[in-house]
Amino acid sequence: MPRSFLVKKIKGDGFQCSGVPAPTYHPLETAYVLPGARGPPGDNGYAPHRLPPSSYDADQKPGLELAPAEPAYPPAAPEEYSDPESPQSSLSARYFRGEAAVTDSYSMDAFFISDGRSRRRRGGGGGDAGGSGDAGGAGGRAGRAGAQAGGGHRHACAECGKTYATSSNLSRHKQTHRSLDSQLARKCPTCGKAYVSMPALAMHLLTHNLRHKCGVCGKAFSRPWLLQGHMRSHTGEKPFGCAHCGKAFADRSNLRAHMQTHSAFKHYRCRQCDKSFALKSYLHKHCEAACAKAAEPPPPTPAGPAS
């Protein structure tokens, strides 16, 4: 899983106002959550279980000052891993010391805020699937901010019609239209595989340098977070929990896909049974399993012995 998809935690302000019920704070939410609070569905199809900032800012006591926000992760030395998904993270260390498991709750709003690939906001120029996936989280946020500042202008590809928020994302996409016979195509010096996209070639080169090895089974990986995900198969750790139903996952990408099942927007519909799904992959699985079996004719009944 690319480093750009890591969702950083946001530390809340530890102050409480009179007249307002004590709120709870989710690690990745940017607003306080009231127990049992309900409201109409938001723009992303979820109920906004949050207390608006205006309701507690008005009752702030005179002379009360908020402590300055501290960084969510302390600075680490160059040889240390500050990445929470690294194999040397404190979370993995607690597992190997036999301490209790910790699962953080994540809501879909956290992915809309921090995930560069997140898209589909109602009335807001729904981007395509590959619009900012290569650019990463920071690039995705910058691209969306630039699109809003520029009146929603999108950069369109002249060959396939796909649109992108930034010209750099469009330029990166145009590389995929190159021919393998083009002079701009490059080959891997190790295995000779040809690529027309330079970011794809860069990711491929990492597969020939498997520096991160599992201390349990010896399997090697090109990236520390890939090793971290593999280590969870040994520890049983599931640190990514759904804030809506409580189901936990070992990998953030699996949680992101699961979040779509809670969405009110299900765009993919089966043509045979009219059932709708939030993800195209779920529709494919449904068509291959349930509908495909229902459409098959029953096997012929074997004829009995002739009398």
Curated annotation (Swiss-Prot):
GO terms for molecular function: DNA-binding transcription factor activity, RNA polymerase II-specific; DNA-binding transcription repressor activity, RNA polymerase II-specific; E-box binding; RNA polymerase II cis-regulatory region sequence-specific DNA binding; sequence-specific double-stranded DNA binding; zinc ion binding. Residues 124-148 have a biased composition (Gly residues). One of its GO terms (cellular component) is chromatin. It comes from the Eukaryota. A zinc finger (C2H2-type) spans 155-177, 186-208, 212-234, 240-262, 268-291. Residues 1-20 are annotated as: SNAG domain. GO terms for biological process: negative regulation of extrinsic apoptotic signaling pathway via death domain receptors; negative regulation of transcription by RNA polymerase II; regulation of DNA-templated transcription; regulation of neuron migration. It is found in: Nucleus. Its main location: nucleus. InterPro entries: Snail/Krueppel_Znf (IPR050527), Znf_C2H2_sf (IPR036236), Znf_C2H2_type (IPR013087). Residues 34-90, 116-148 are annotated as: Disordered. Pfam families: zf-C2H2 (PF00096). Keywords: DNA-binding, Metal-binding, Nucleus, Repeat, Transcription, Transcription regulation, Zinc, Zinc-finger. SMART domains: ZnF_C2H2 (SM00355). May be involved in transcriptional regulation. Belongs to the snail C2H2-type zinc-finger protein family. This is Transcriptional repressor scratch 2. The lineage of its organism: Eukaryota, Metazoa, Chordata, Craniata, Vertebrata.
